[in-house]
Protein backbone atom coordinates (compact mmCIF):
# COMPACT_ATOMS: atom_id res chain seq x y z
CA UNK A 1 0.00 0.00 0.00
CA UNK A 2 1.19 3.54 -0.74
CA UNK A 3 2.26 5.79 2.14
CA UNK A 4 0.53 8.82 0.63
CA UNK A 5 -1.83 10.26 -1.97
CA UNK A 6 -2.08 13.22 -4.33
CA UNK A 7 -4.69 15.94 -3.92
CA UNK A 8 -5.31 19.66 -4.04
CA UNK A 9 -5.86 22.38 -1.49
CA UNK A 10 -9.45 23.59 -1.10
CA UNK A 11 -8.98 26.26 1.57
CA UNK A 12 -8.96 26.89 5.31
CA UNK A 13 -11.73 26.59 7.87
CA UNK A 14 -12.19 25.82 11.56
CA UNK A 15 -13.84 23.05 13.54
CA UNK A 16 -14.59 22.45 17.22
CA UNK A 17 -13.26 19.57 19.29
CA UNK A 18 -15.10 17.76 22.11
CA UNK A 19 -14.06 20.42 24.65
CA UNK A 20 -15.35 23.25 22.45
CA UNK A 21 -11.90 24.49 21.42
CA UNK A 22 -11.50 25.96 17.93
CA UNK A 23 -9.06 24.06 15.70
CA UNK A 24 -7.89 25.85 12.51
CA UNK A 25 -7.86 23.30 9.70
CA UNK A 26 -6.94 23.11 6.04
CA UNK A 27 -9.38 21.26 3.80
CA UNK A 28 -7.72 19.03 1.19
CA UNK A 29 -9.42 17.20 -1.66
CA UNK A 30 -7.45 13.95 -1.76
CA UNK A 31 -7.72 11.36 -4.53
CA UNK A 32 -9.06 9.12 -5.80
CA UNK A 33 -5.67 8.23 -7.28
CA UNK A 34 -5.14 5.55 -9.92
CA UNK A 35 -2.13 3.24 -9.69
CA UNK A 36 -0.15 3.84 -12.89
CA UNK A 37 2.87 1.65 -12.08
CA UNK A 38 4.05 -0.74 -9.37
CA UNK A 39 7.83 -0.90 -8.89
CA UNK A 40 9.53 -3.93 -7.36
CA UNK A 41 12.97 -4.82 -6.04
CA UNK A 42 13.48 -7.36 -8.83
CA UNK A 43 12.84 -4.91 -11.68
CA UNK A 44 13.67 -1.50 -10.23
CA UNK A 45 15.83 -2.10 -7.17
CA UNK A 46 13.26 -0.75 -4.70
CA UNK A 47 9.56 -0.96 -3.93
CA UNK A 48 7.30 1.95 -4.79
CA UNK A 49 3.90 2.80 -6.21
CA UNK A 50 3.37 5.47 -8.87
CA UNK A 51 0.01 7.25 -8.60
CA UNK A 52 -1.85 9.35 -11.17
CA UNK A 53 -4.27 12.15 -10.29
CA UNK A 54 -6.81 14.33 -12.13
CA UNK A 55 -8.00 13.66 -15.67
CA UNK A 56 -6.91 15.99 -18.48
CA UNK A 57 -7.44 16.21 -22.24
CA UNK A 58 -5.32 14.03 -24.50
CA UNK A 59 -3.77 17.07 -26.19
CA UNK A 60 -2.37 18.23 -22.83
CA UNK A 61 -0.06 15.25 -22.37
CA UNK A 62 2.96 13.89 -24.22
CA UNK A 63 2.89 10.74 -26.33
CA UNK A 64 5.37 9.00 -24.02
CA UNK A 65 3.26 9.69 -20.93
CA UNK A 66 0.08 8.72 -22.75
CA UNK A 67 1.55 5.32 -23.71
CA UNK A 68 2.93 4.84 -20.20
CA UNK A 69 -0.52 5.35 -18.66
CA UNK A 70 -2.18 3.21 -21.33
CA UNK A 71 -0.20 0.18 -20.10
CA UNK A 72 -2.17 0.44 -16.85
CA UNK A 73 -5.43 1.04 -18.72
CA UNK A 74 -5.57 4.72 -17.75
CA UNK A 75 -6.27 7.89 -19.70
CA UNK A 76 -4.20 11.10 -19.60
CA UNK A 77 -3.55 12.44 -16.09
CA UNK A 78 -2.31 15.80 -14.83
CA UNK A 79 0.01 14.63 -12.03
CA UNK A 80 2.19 11.55 -11.55
CA UNK A 81 3.89 11.00 -8.19
CA UNK A 82 5.77 8.11 -6.67
CA UNK A 83 5.38 6.90 -3.08
CA UNK A 84 7.27 4.25 -1.17
CA UNK A 85 5.07 1.24 -0.49
CA UNK A 86 4.59 -1.05 2.49
CA UNK A 87 2.68 -4.29 2.91
CA UNK A 88 0.67 -5.63 -0.02
CA UNK A 89 0.99 -3.58 -3.21
CA UNK A 90 -2.12 -2.88 -5.32
CA UNK A 91 -2.19 -3.82 -8.99
CA UNK A 92 -1.64 -1.33 -11.81
CA UNK A 93 -4.92 0.25 -12.88
CA UNK A 94 -6.58 -0.03 -9.46
CA UNK A 95 -7.82 3.04 -7.58
CA UNK A 96 -6.78 4.17 -4.10
CA UNK A 97 -9.22 6.25 -2.09
CA UNK A 98 -8.72 8.41 0.96
CA UNK A 99 -9.92 5.77 3.43
CA UNK A 100 -7.46 3.21 2.03
CA UNK A 101 -4.44 5.20 3.21
CA UNK A 102 -5.41 7.66 5.96
CA UNK A 103 -7.29 7.53 9.25
CA UNK A 104 -8.22 10.12 11.87
CA UNK A 105 -5.31 11.01 14.21
CA UNK A 106 -2.66 10.10 11.60
CA UNK A 107 0.34 12.45 11.52
CA UNK A 108 1.20 13.54 7.97
CA UNK A 109 3.48 15.81 5.99
CA UNK A 110 2.14 17.92 3.12
CA UNK A 111 4.27 19.11 0.19
CA UNK A 112 3.22 21.84 -2.24
CA UNK A 113 4.36 25.05 -3.94
CA UNK A 114 4.18 28.08 -1.65
CA UNK A 115 2.45 31.32 -2.60
CA UNK A 116 4.51 33.57 -4.86
CA UNK A 117 5.22 37.00 -3.33
CA UNK A 118 7.17 38.55 -6.19
CA UNK A 119 10.28 40.70 -5.64
CA UNK A 120 10.61 41.53 -1.94
CA UNK A 121 13.13 43.27 0.29
CA UNK A 122 15.11 41.74 3.12
CA UNK A 123 12.59 42.71 5.82
CA UNK A 124 9.78 40.67 4.31
CA UNK A 125 11.93 38.03 2.63
CA UNK A 126 14.33 37.21 5.48
CA UNK A 127 12.83 38.90 8.54
CA UNK A 128 15.57 41.53 8.99
CA UNK A 129 14.93 44.10 11.70
CA UNK A 130 15.59 47.10 9.46
CA UNK A 131 16.73 50.47 10.76
CA UNK A 132 15.22 52.96 13.22
CA UNK A 133 11.69 54.13 12.53
CA UNK A 134 12.30 57.78 13.46
CA UNK A 135 11.89 60.60 10.95
CA UNK A 136 15.55 61.51 10.85
CA UNK A 137 16.74 57.97 10.19
CA UNK A 138 16.51 57.68 6.39
CA UNK A 139 17.25 54.00 6.96
CA UNK A 140 14.08 52.03 7.57
CA UNK A 141 13.99 48.83 5.50
CA UNK A 142 17.47 48.71 3.92
CA UNK A 143 19.67 45.59 4.16
CA UNK A 144 22.46 47.56 5.86
CA UNK A 145 26.20 46.93 5.77
CA UNK A 146 27.15 43.72 3.99
CA UNK A 147 30.47 44.21 2.17
CA UNK A 148 32.73 44.78 5.20
CA UNK A 149 35.80 46.96 4.48
CA UNK A 150 38.53 47.00 1.86
CA UNK A 151 39.94 43.62 2.91
CA UNK A 152 37.31 41.42 1.21
CA UNK A 153 36.26 44.41 -0.90
CA UNK A 154 33.22 42.45 -2.01
CA UNK A 155 30.00 40.88 -0.81
CA UNK A 156 30.39 37.22 0.12
CA UNK A 157 28.29 34.54 -1.54
CA UNK A 158 25.22 33.50 0.40
CA UNK A 159 24.41 36.90 1.91
CA UNK A 160 20.66 37.33 2.34
CA UNK A 161 19.57 39.93 -0.22
CA UNK A 162 16.31 41.10 -1.81
CA UNK A 163 14.86 38.89 -4.52
CA UNK A 164 11.97 36.77 -5.67
CA UNK A 165 10.07 35.36 -2.72
CA UNK A 166 7.88 32.27 -2.48
CA UNK A 167 6.72 29.99 -5.30
CA UNK A 168 9.02 27.24 -4.03
CA UNK A 169 8.49 23.61 -3.14
CA UNK A 170 7.67 23.57 0.57
CA UNK A 171 6.95 20.76 3.04
CA UNK A 172 5.05 21.16 6.31
CA UNK A 173 5.45 18.28 8.74
CA UNK A 174 3.59 16.98 11.81
CA UNK A 175 0.07 17.91 10.71
CA UNK A 176 -2.66 15.86 12.36
CA UNK A 177 -5.65 14.43 10.48
CA UNK A 178 -8.70 15.59 12.47
CA UNK A 179 -11.55 14.60 10.16
CA UNK A 180 -12.23 12.62 6.96
CA UNK A 181 -15.20 12.97 4.61
CA UNK A 182 -15.15 9.81 2.49
CA UNK A 183 -18.12 10.79 0.30
CA UNK A 184 -16.48 14.01 -0.94
CA UNK A 185 -12.85 12.80 -0.63
CA UNK A 186 -12.03 15.58 1.85
CA UNK A 187 -9.24 15.44 4.42
CA UNK A 188 -9.13 17.96 7.28
CA UNK A 189 -5.66 18.56 8.74
CA UNK A 190 -4.79 20.85 11.63
CA UNK A 191 -2.76 23.91 10.69
CA UNK A 192 -1.71 25.54 7.43
CA UNK A 193 -0.59 24.00 4.15
CA UNK A 194 1.60 25.63 1.43
CA UNK A 195 0.02 27.25 -1.62
CA UNK A 196 -3.22 28.81 -2.75
CA UNK A 197 -6.57 27.18 -3.40
CA UNK A 198 -6.35 24.44 -6.08
CA UNK A 199 -2.60 23.99 -5.53
CA UNK A 200 -1.63 20.38 -6.20
CA UNK A 201 -0.19 18.81 -3.04
CA UNK A 202 1.06 15.43 -1.86
CA UNK A 203 0.08 14.04 1.54
CA UNK A 204 2.26 11.38 3.10
CA UNK A 205 2.11 9.56 6.43
CA UNK A 206 5.13 10.10 8.67
From Swiss-Prot:
Cystine bridges: none
In the record, biological process GO terms are: translation
A Pfam cross-reference name = Ribosomal_L3
Any idea which GO molecular function terms this record carries? rRNA binding; structural constituent of ribosome
Q: Name one GO cellular component term.
A: cytosolic large ribosomal subunit
Top-level taxon in the UniProt lineage: Bacteria
Q: Which InterPro entries does the entry link to?
A: Ribosomal_uL3 (IPR000597), Ribosomal_uL3_bac/org-type (IPR019927), Transl_B-barrel_sf (IPR009000)
Annotated region Disordered: where?
126-155
Give the record's keywords alphabetically: Ribonucleoprotein, Ribosomal protein, RNA-binding, rRNA-binding
- Family per similarity comment: Belongs to the universal ribosomal protein uL3 family.
How the protein assembles, per its UniProt entry? Part of the 50S ribosomal subunit. Forms a cluster with proteins L14 and L19.
Briefly state the protein's biological role: One of the primary rRNA binding proteins, it binds directly near the 3'-end of the 23S rRNA, where it nucleates assembly of the 50S subunit.
Q: Which PANTHER family match?
A: 50S RIBOSOMAL PROTEIN L3, LARGE RIBOSOMAL SUBUNIT PROTEIN UL3C
Q: Spell out the protein name for this chain.
A: Large ribosomal subunit protein uL3
Q: Which organism is it from?
A: Leptospira interrogans serogroup Icterohaemorrhagiae serovar Lai (strain 56601)
Amino acid sequence: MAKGLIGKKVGMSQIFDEQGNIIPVTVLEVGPCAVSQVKSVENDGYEAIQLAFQDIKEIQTSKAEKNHLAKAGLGPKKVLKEFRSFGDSPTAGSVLKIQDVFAVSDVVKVTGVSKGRGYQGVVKRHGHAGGPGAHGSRFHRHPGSMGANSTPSRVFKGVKLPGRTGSQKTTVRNLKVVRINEEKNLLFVSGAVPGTANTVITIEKI
